[in-house]
């Protein structure tokens, strides 16, 4: 189990770095958006490339932020009975949710997003907008993000099994959201 826990903590470290990149992308997207608005409405200058950079950065925000959100246990969850369960019950729900829903869904998404990226990369697909950018960098964010969410899911499953077997101590405090 110790080798698996080392793997899980290594994945956590990578996810944290991805989260930092996502946070930086949010700032860059906001600055570029403000700059685009100023140039467009203040100086009557527009650039499709700069507009498209914004959605590239949005892809980074979402796809690189997702594994970090999962690591921090801050993801959206449908709380019907979760908050009423014991700590052990919540850990079991998390573990089963990861194994039965998260990992299979990420597998399907990886299966379909990888060929999409490869096709865009091989053909050099460009934006249809004048002055637009190549599309494969944004498409690459999909399989990369799904892969990282998958790895983070495996990490979370390992840590929960570790908690259940008393070989890993984790904070399982759950704060029910305001309703």
Segments predicted by a language model, with ranges:
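Alpha-helical transmembrane segments and membrane-interface helix-loop junctions
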Residues: 1-179
């Amino acid at each position: 189990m110790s080798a698996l826990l080392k793997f899980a903590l290594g994945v956590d470290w990578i996810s944290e770095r991805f989260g930092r990149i996502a946070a930086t992308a949010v700032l860059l997207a906001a600055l570029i958006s403000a700059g685009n608005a100023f140039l467009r409405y203040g100086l009557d200058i527009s650039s499709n490339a700069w507009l498209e950079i914004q959605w590239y950065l949005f892809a980074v925000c979402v796809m690189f932020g997702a594994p970090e959100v999962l690591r921090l246990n801050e993801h959206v969850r449908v709380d019907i009975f979760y908050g009423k369960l014991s700590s052990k019950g919540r850990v079991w729900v998390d573990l089963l949710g990861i194994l039965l829903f998260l990992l299979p869904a990420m597998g399907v998404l990886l299966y379909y997003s990888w060929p999409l990226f490869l096709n865009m990369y091989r053909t050099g697909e460009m934006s249809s907008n004048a002055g637009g950018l190549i599309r494969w960098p944004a498409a690459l964010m999909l399989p990369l993000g799904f892969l990282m969410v998958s790895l983070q899911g495996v990490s979370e499953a390992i840590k929960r099994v570790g908690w259940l077997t008393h070989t890993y101590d984790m904070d399982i405090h759950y704060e029910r959201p305001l309703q």
